[in-house]
From Swiss-Prot:
This is Chorismate synthase. GO terms for biological process: amino acid biosynthetic process; aromatic amino acid family biosynthetic process; chorismate biosynthetic process. It catalyses: 5-O-(1-carboxyvinyl)-3-phosphoshikimate = chorismate + phosphate. It comes from Vibrio vulnificus (strain CMCP6). The keyword Cell division does not apply. PROSITE patterns: CHORISMATE_SYNTHASE_1 (PS00787), CHORISMATE_SYNTHASE_2 (PS00788), CHORISMATE_SYNTHASE_3 (PS00789). Disulfide bonds: none annotated. Reduced FMN (FMNH(2)). FMN binds at R125, S126, S127, N238, A239, G278, K293, P294, T295, S296, S297, R319. Pathway: Metabolic intermediate biosynthesis; chorismate biosynthesis; chorismate from D-erythrose 4-phosphate and phosphoenolpyruvate: step 7/7. The lineage of its organism: Bacteria, Pseudomonadati, Pseudomonadota, Gammaproteobacteria, Vibrionales. Homotetramer. CDD domains: Chorismate_synthase (cd07304).
Length: 361
């Protein structure tokens, strides 16, 4: 079955291609009565939107979202919410040279072999353009989580290439085009992007995404563990090649006495587990990191083949991000929000009346 949907109780289904007429999604399962407007969704969409700075692709899409259904007099009705964003700045001629060639490092070859046909314009369905609808749907989840439960989901760029942050100031993130929480690293990020543009190359990145005030108890062992679904959602983002929950791969060198998060009446002594134990939220911050590969859409020539299997070379034309990690920050927030929202509704449906004598720490 086609993999265009995510979630069970809060379910998001997206459609559309990079150079198609429009992008869209259907959001099922949102509780009724949530005050929501196009302006609420637009805030996050503008953070992801292309062409907003010299550090990202210069494709200029307004990404103005339209709410087609599921909202009446400013409130959700409990029915399917239909969202639509029109594509307005396609330059399909930029891709005429790759009609019969496969861009190395992209999904061209695999889509062609799987479906026997591919939309070569900007990558079609495999383009990160599709994530605009995830961000729109995620904005609904973020607002509900914040209003109903005080859950807040935020992310930041923690590393680009060899440049890594040394500190986190949440108030600094929206003050620069890199979503960087360390003001002392902004200039280094700026210089790195400038150098990459001169070279016609790209670079990878790392993003940390955090959910605070998540209730204890979310997650459905054993196959729908909360961390498993988070990893699934984050890995579904274009260019993501690695996901860590909590300390992630650092646990390899840790001892049990160091890694375990001790408990006391005052709370947990640490959060190496990233807010999840046994696939269930602990009530601590949920912390995840994602690693994004450098985009293969670069002007450095690369070896490839054409549809006939013949050797050739390719220089990618078009408008592309030197570092896709920059605009992936709001996408990571959206995907974590969608998963937490889904699990919160699932937990409420099955375990609403559950209580224990043990105090929540």
């Amino acid at each position: 079955m086609a993999g265009n949907s995510i979630g069970q109780h809060f379910r998001v289904t997206t459609f559309g291609e990079s150079h198609g007429i429009a992008l869209g999604c259907i959001v099922d399962g949102c509780p009724p009565g949530l005050e929501i407007s196009e302006a609420d969704l637009q805030t996050d969409l503008d953070r992801r939107r292309p062409g907003t700075s010299r550090y990202t692709t210069q494709r200029r899409e307004p990404d103005e979202v339209k709410i087609l259904s599921g909202v009446f007099e400013g409130k959700t009705t409990g029915t399917s919410i239909g969202l639509l964003i029109e594509n307005t700045d396609q330059r399909s001629k930029d891709y005429s040279d790759i009609k019969d060639k496969f861009r190395p490092g992209h999904a061209d070859y695999t889509y062609h072999q799987k479906y026997g046909i591919r939309d070569y314009r900007g990558g079609g369905r495999s383009s990160a353009r599709e994530t605009a609808m995830r961000v729109a749907a995620g904005a609904i989840a973020k607002k509900y989580l914040k209003q109903a439960f005080g859950v807040e989901i935020r992310a930041y760029l923690s590393q680009m290439g060899d440049v890594a942050i040394d500190k986190v100031d949440w108030n600094e993130i929206e003050n620069n085009p890199f979503f960087c929480p360390d003001v002392d690293k902004v200039e280094a990020f700026d210089q790195l992007i400038r150098d990459l543009k001169k070279e016609g190359d790209s670079i990878g990145a790392k993003i940390q995404v955090v959910a605070t005030n998540v209730p204890v108890g979310l997650g459905e062992p054993v196959f729908d563990r909360l961390d498993a679904d988070i990893a699934h959602a984050l890995m579904s983002i274009n260019a993501v090649k690695g996901v860590e929950i909590g300390d992630g791969f650092d646990v390899v060198s840790q001892k049990g006495s160091q890694h375990r998060d001790t408990l006391s009446p005052q709370g947990f002594g640490s959060n190496h587990a990233g807010g999840i134990l046994g696939g269930i939220s602990t009530g601590q911050d949920i912390v995840a990191n994602i690693a994004l590969k450098p985009t293969s859409s670069i002007t450095v020539p690369g070896d490839t083949i054409n549809v006939d299997g013949e050797s050739t070379q390719l220089i990618t034309k078009g408008r592309h991000d030197p570092c896709v990690g920059i605009r992936a920050v709001p996408i990571a927030e959206a995907m974590l929000a969608i998963v937490v929202m889904d699990h919160l509704l699932r937990h409420r449906g099955q375990n609403h009346g559950v209580s224990t004598q043990t105090p929540k720490i």
